[in-house]
Regions:
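N-terminal Rossmann-fold NAD(P) dinucleotide-binding loop
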Residues: 15, 179-180
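Short, acidic, Ser/Thr-enriched surface-loop or helix-capping motifs
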Residues: 112, 284-286, 389-390
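Glycine-rich flavin
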Residues: 2-4, 20-27, 33-166, 194, ...
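Short hydrophobic core segments
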Residues: 7-9, 115, 130-140, 172-173, ...
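Beta1/beta-strand and adjacent pyrophosphate-binding region of the FAD-binding site
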Residues: 1-12, 166-176
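FAD-site-proximal beta/loop scaffold in flavoenzymes
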Residues: 151-167, 249-326, 415
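Flexible, glycine-rich terminal cap/loop adjacent to redox cofactors
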Residues: 9-18, 23-37, 42, 49, ...
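Gly/Ala-rich phosphate-binding loop of Rossmann-like dinucleotide-binding domains
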Residues: 19, 23, 183, 187-188
Length: 459
């Protein structure tokens, strides 16, 4: 008789959420985590949570610096980097213990060991063998380093969290989400920041219009960005790091390589277990099933969408399919993406360019935060909301750059997920004065009816 109904490999936001859902369905569940200090996965320990804790500290610093604008006199604030790191560690530690407590409270057996498929639905765990009715693979991802000479001289998104002081200058290689978040963070903390990106825009696949506006804001804040630039070498010269790229050379105290992540699928025993892969990723169908009987996979290891909330959603779907009577398919239409820069950026669904490329007849509405009462009160007027709808007015996508964009995107995701029109969104009464009013105004603007901007010129 199997020891468990479900054995989960990996305790990140996919694995631990799936384990809890399974336990609450009455299943006997075991979950494996290879690192005793890694419960909660990369997101909690080295990614989402620690970085946002540091970013929050930088935002407080910025708010204090601007206190005079609001009639408040304060002394010039100073960055206490060790204290910021200490707070970050306390937040992470508390949340890690919270995850362990939730698993324990739900009767999930926690095993600190590297899990490996041992044939069928058996999993080996450092000398112990666990036999389950099903297996859920949630091993996450690891930092992907480019094949650049001297790359070992650079920091990664993992190691930069442990630097002893804020660098006076920083070169960030990679203009994706991770790279731009760290660029924004250290710019706020006083570093001279330069970004080198191989593509012709940062934050792809962000709406190009918004990406361009974001670049202009970065330039205003002193961040230098080189687009279409390929890094050729990293070296040490005169006590500094030297970065040679296709457009020239840069020197800085530190270099951060933020060129992406890859599925953490090594040494899982996939091939021997008959689990097919798509490159480095585990291949899954719409039900999150792998090619092996009763083996499912979720999260970054599937490379469907390397987002923590996608992994959690996939975990819920996979558990329902593994243990339930009805099959359900994963739907990624309304998965939002968030970027914790200054200002914040968030998007869900299709950008205008993606919608047009898909052959849609597109209608677009925009509304700037500079015309919004709440944004003016907050003194945060950079950015806009952009709504993309089809010819019948149904939402195709929303992009937001501005204050609390990462919170505001939830309403847009809900609207896109349930399939409403821009007009229906605009008819929802939004409290005044609030930031979500910008979304309602942008939805009104799809039909040229936004109230708090000048009317469009008639042709």
């Amino acid at each position: 008789m199997p020891d468990f109904d479900l054995t989960v490999i990996g305790s990140g936001p996919g694995g631990y959420v799936a384990a809890i859902h399974a336990a609450r369905m009455g299943a006997r569940v075991a979950i494996l985590e290879q690192d005793a200090a890694g419960w909660g996965g990369t997101c909690l320990n080295w990614g989402c949570i620690p970085t946002k804790s540091l970013i929050q500290g930088a935002e407080v610093l910025q708010a204090v610096r601007r206190a005079g604008e609001f009639g408040v006199r304060v002394a010039e604030p100073e960055v206490d980097w060790p204290a910021m790191r200490g707070r970050k560690d306390r937040v992470v530690g508390g949340m890690r213990r919270g995850v362990q407590g939730l698993l324990e409270a739900n009767g999930v057996e926690m095993v600190t060991a590297r899990g490996r498929l041992a044939g069928g639905t058996r999993v080996s765990a450092d000398g112990r063998e666990l036999h389950g009715r099903g297996v859920l693979l949630a091993p996450g991802s690891v930092v992907a380093l480019p094949p650049v000479p001297g790359v070992e001289l650079a920091l990664t998104s993992d190691t930069i969290l442990g630097v002893e002081r804020v660098p006076g200058s920083l070169v960030v290689i990679g203009g994706g989400v991770v790279g731009m978040e760290f660029a924004s963070l250290f710019n706020l903390l006083g570093s001279r920041v330069t970004v080198v990106e191989m593509l012709d825009q940062v934050l792809a696949p962000l709406d190009p219009e918004v990406a361009g506006a974001f670049l202009r804001l970065l330039a205003r804040r002193g961040v230098e960005v080189h687009l279409g630039a390929r890094v050729e070498e990293i070296a040490v010269e005169g006590g500094l790091r030297r970065v040679r790229f296709s457009g020239g050379e840069l020197r800085a105290e530190q270099v951060l390589v933020a060129t992406g992540r890859r599925p953490n699928t090594g040494d899982l025993g996939l091939e021997a277990a008959g689990v097919a892969t798509d490159g480095p990723a585990i291949a899954v169908d719409g039900h999150l099933r792998t090619s092996a009987e009763a083996v499912y996979a979720i999260g970054d290891a599937t490379a469907v969408s390397m987002l923590a909330h996608t992994a959690s959603y996939q975990g819920e779907v996979a558990v329902a399919n593994a243990l339930g009577e009805k099959r359900i398919s994963a739907d990624y239409t309304a998965i939002p993406a968030c970027v914790y820069t200054e200002p914040e950026i968030a998007f869900v669904g299709l950008s205008e360019a993606q919608a047009r490329a898909a052959g849609e007849e597109v209608r677009v509405g925009r509304f700037p935060f500079s015309a919004l009462g709440r944004a003016l009160v907050l003194g945060e007027t950079d950015g806009l909301v952009k709504v993309v709808a089809d010819a019948d007015g149904y939402l195709l996508g929303v992009t937001i750059m501005g204050p609390r964009a990462t919170d505001l995107i939830a309403e847009a995701a809900l609207g896109l997920g349930v399939g409403i029109t821009a007009a229906e969104l605009s008819h929802v009464v939004h409290a005044h004065p609030t930031l979500p009013e910008a979304l309602a105004e942008a939805a009104l603007d799809v039909a040229g009816r936004a109230v708090h901007v000048a009317p469009r010129r008639r042709r």
